């Protein structure tokens, strides 16, 4: 299967730079599957995960807080505010942040709008999904 170059960068650092067979992400208009030779595209991406299929058919997961995805004939670039490899996520920290976000929604925290609170909870749930998917992929390798 043909490959293409994928670059994933956050505001702080380069997260991924290499040849891949494909990626899956959630764009502003729905789910995207990108393979080599995809037509050019520029789209906003929603907070969630990017699932990468590497050259050796292994998979990697990256949490994305949102951003943009650009597809060119031989290169795909993901520009994200925050991007964290699934293997670098800390389950306990995610669960604690999720618990706090849920408490803030229930108590109606005065320092934030309801939409901001729900957005925070959604980001933590996406991180948890990235962690769990990475954990499953890691167990499959064993």
UniProtKB/Swiss-Prot annotation:
Q: Which GO terms describe its cellular component?
A: plasma membrane; proton-transporting ATP synthase complex
Residue ranges spanning the membrane: these are none
> Taking the first listed entry, what is the main subcellular location of this protein, grouped into a coarse class?
membrane
| Gene of this entry | atpC
- How is this protein situated with respect to the membrane? Peripheral membrane protein
Subcellular location, in the record's words? Cell inner membrane
Note whether RNA-binding occurs among the keywords: no
**Protein family (similarity comment):** Belongs to the ATPase epsilon chain family.
Q: How does it assemble?
A: F-type ATPases have 2 components, CF(1) - the catalytic core - and CF(0) - the membrane proton channel. CF(1) has five subunits: alpha(3), beta(3), gamma(1), delta(1), epsilon(1). CF(0) has three main subunits: a, b and c.
Pfam families assigned to the protein according to its UniProt record, in alphabetical order: ATP-synt_DE_N
Protein species of origin: Histophilus somni (strain 2336) (Haemophilus somnus)
**Top-rank lineage group of the source organism:** Bacteria
Q: What is this protein called?
A: ATP synthase epsilon chain
Q: What is the documented function of this protein?
A: Produces ATP from ADP in the presence of a proton gradient across the membrane.
One example of the protein's molecular function in GO is:
proton-transporting ATP synthase activity, rotational mechanism
Report keywords, A-Z: ATP synthesis, Cell inner membrane, Cell membrane, CF(1), Hydrogen ion transport, Ion transport, Membrane, Transport
């Amino acid at each position: 299967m043909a490959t293409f170059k994928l670059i994933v960068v956050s505001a702080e650092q380069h997260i991924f730079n290499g040849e891949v067979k494909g990626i899956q992400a959630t764009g502003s208009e729905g789910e995207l599957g990108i393979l080599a030779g995809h037509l050019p595209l520029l789209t906003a991406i929603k907070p969630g995960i990017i699932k990468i299929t590497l050259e050796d058919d292994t998979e990697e997961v990256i949490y994305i807080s949102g951003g943009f995805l650009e597809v060119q004939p031989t290169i795909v670039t993901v520009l994200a505010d925050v991007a964290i490899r699934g293997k670098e996520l800390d389950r306990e920290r995610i669960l604690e942040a999720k618990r706090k976000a849920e408490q803030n929604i229930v108590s109606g925290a005065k320092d934030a709008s309801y939409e901001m609170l729900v957005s925070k909870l959604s980001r933590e749930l996406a991180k948890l999904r990235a962690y769990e998917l990475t954990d499953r992929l890691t167990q499959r390798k064993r």
